[in-house]
Amino acid sequence: MDKLVPDVFKNKISDIIIEDDFDKENLVQETIACIEFDNFECKFECYKFQSSKSDSPESDISHNINIYTPIIYDYQNYQIDNSAVDILNQLNLKNNTFNRKMLFVLIHNFTMRVTDLCGYSIGLSEFNCDKIDKIKKKIQILVD
């Protein structure tokens, strides 16, 4: 997990919530469900699995939708949405090129690990989901 978080953010993150998903063959896949910062309410757009007292399997999952949707605009030039850059201000980090690149790396690593980021109940718009899907395809081409 340490490799996913740039050093500049390591002492600023209070929690990284991991969820276990079971695929069709019942193999466990660990994904990051949420990254939560220490000294303010901002979290990455995500959801958490939370137990419910209901007996119904459908209602055993409740969604916790958060306020920010940090989106990468341009993979080549480290461009991210201004609402994501606001995270630097709230963490009292300088809004300079290095910190923006490190924030980009954090967001990139986060979005690449979340498998169901564009699910209908997560709260991302189709426009933003399309951007994430294009980035994933572009990265897959680079890796292959």
From Swiss-Prot:
Protein family (similarity comment): Belongs to the mimivirus L885/R898 family.
Protein name listed in UniProt: Uncharacterized protein L885
Organism name: Acanthamoeba polyphaga mimivirus (APMV)
